[in-house]
């Protein structure tokens, strides 16, 4: 059972205030290092988290963990009575026409030409990372292009797929007590410099998608290196945002 599962709300999962522990525990690290090509199910990933105590009582703090998103993915799959990837395709990818975006469900499934992700070794040299997307599950097992990412940034930031009241609720937030760099974390997305969207990092890739609801501008940034001690796309975005904001609307 999820620690405090009888008290946690769906909103608390989405705004990172549930207290759910992170699934990337020492036990998970040991299992992954022993077999980097092992295919993990979402249930298996969640099980690593469930072996740990809750970080805090629901609603007490806001600490970002990918376990929250894994749990939401399971809720979505149960609600629609479909595998999570099928729900994403049917209700997001296809309606938005994201023809270059995929939810990856297998190890090394990324087809066609694509960048290799790198992390820095202890000696400072970049090392290529494998493409085991099953390690990420609903928390990040997707591939895309900058063009599609810009389209997604607009849809996410404007609430194109949601009722207006739902989108307004999603814009309510507060700073994280611990987690990725955001000015505030909202409901399933974050804010930076008055823009809303999300960042991500995994397997040597770092990304950012942001949308300005006032101007309608969207920005997507992707890099094929991580473990630099800071999220570089966020650093770039903070420099880019004032420039884009200064451009008069067309």
Give the ranges of each region predicted by the language model:
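Short, well-structured active-site flanking segments
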Residues: 1, 79-107, 163-168
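Active-site-proximal loop and beta-strand segments within enzyme catalytic domains
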Residues: 1-65
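Secretory-pathway/luminal and periplasmic proteins that interact with or process carbohydrate-rich
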Residues: 2-9, 18-25, 95-105, 175-184
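Solvent-exposed, acidic/flexible segments
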Residues: 3-7, 38-42, 61-69, 77, ...
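Alpha-helical scaffold elements that line and support the substrate/ligand-binding pocket
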Residues: 13, 50, 63-97, 148-155, ...
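The feature captures the short pre-catalytic strand/loop hairpin that immediately precedes
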Residues: 43-55, 119-134
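Catalytic loop of the DD-peptidase/beta-lactamase superfamily, centered on the K-T-G motif
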Residues: 86-90, 94, 127-250
């Amino acid at each position: 059972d999820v620690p405090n599962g009888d008290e946690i709300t769906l909103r608390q999962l989405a705004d990172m205030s549930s207290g759910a522990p992170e699934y990337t525990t020492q036990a998970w690290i040991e299992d992954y290092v022993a077999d980097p090509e092992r295919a993990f199910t979402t249930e298996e990933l969640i099980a690593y988290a469930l072996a740990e105590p809750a970080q805090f009582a629901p609603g007490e703090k806001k600490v970002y963990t990918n376990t929250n998103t894994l749990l939401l993915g399971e809720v979505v799959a149960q609600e629609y009575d479909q595998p999570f990837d099928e729900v994403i395709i049917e209700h997001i990818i296809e309606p938005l026409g994201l023809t270059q975006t995929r939810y990856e469900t297998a190890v090394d499934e990324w087809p066609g030409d694509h960048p290799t992700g790198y992390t820095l070794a202890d000696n400072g040299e970049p090392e290529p990372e494998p493409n085991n997307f099953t390690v990420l599950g609903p928390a990040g097992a997707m591939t895309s292009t900058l063009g599609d990412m810009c389209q997604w940034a607009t849809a996410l930031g404007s609430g194109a797929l949601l009722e207006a009241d739902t989108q307004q609720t999603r814009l309510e937030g507060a700073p994280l007590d611990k987690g990725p760099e955001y000015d505030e974390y909202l409901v399933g997305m974050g804010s930076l410099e008055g823009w809303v969207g999300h960042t991500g990092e995994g397997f040597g890739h770092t990304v950012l998608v942001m949308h300005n609801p006032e101007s309608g501008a969207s920005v997507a940034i992707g890099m094929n290196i991580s473990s630099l001690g800071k999220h570089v796309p966020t650093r770039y975005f903070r420099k880019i945002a004032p420039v884009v904001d200064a451009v008069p609307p067309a």
